[in-house]
Amino acid sequence: MRGRPCSCAFTGHRRGKLPWGEDESDLRCIALKAKLRAAVESAIHEGMEHFICGMAEGCDLYFAETVLALKSTYPHITLEAAIPCPSQADGWGEAQKSRYRDILARCDYETMVQQSYTPGCMQRRNRYMVDHASLLIAVNDGARGGTRSTIEYAFKRGVNVLDIPLD
């Protein structure tokens, strides 16, 4: 891991909170992925080299796939999977589990935040990411929940936040 000064974490909504749900061919999803790519490239140009992803369904996996795609252009960047607990993907459908495993296999680092599920493990994962970053990229619709809590925690910790509004 590169350490906090050159590290960027990500937070965003799960598939169930996205207006297009599972339909990644929806123009809004395509537009969001383009915004994510632009945000990650901007972060790289500002000196970010290490990217941390919470590996949740939805925006987290879009972010991880974006970083992995950009590694061919920027081979010095690294991707860390910050996993809240080993059972994170257990309740997902087979297609999403396969996607998760594929991304995980391509990560440079894997951090297991705790060894079993507890009600607070997702929040602990989010705090781990913020505590190890100097920039947080956030896809946010402003609603209460884990994404908003992570953004608020980043502000309290003095971590810069790049907000990508969810249209």
List PLM regions with ranges:
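Acidic/glycine-enriched connector segments
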Residues: 1-167
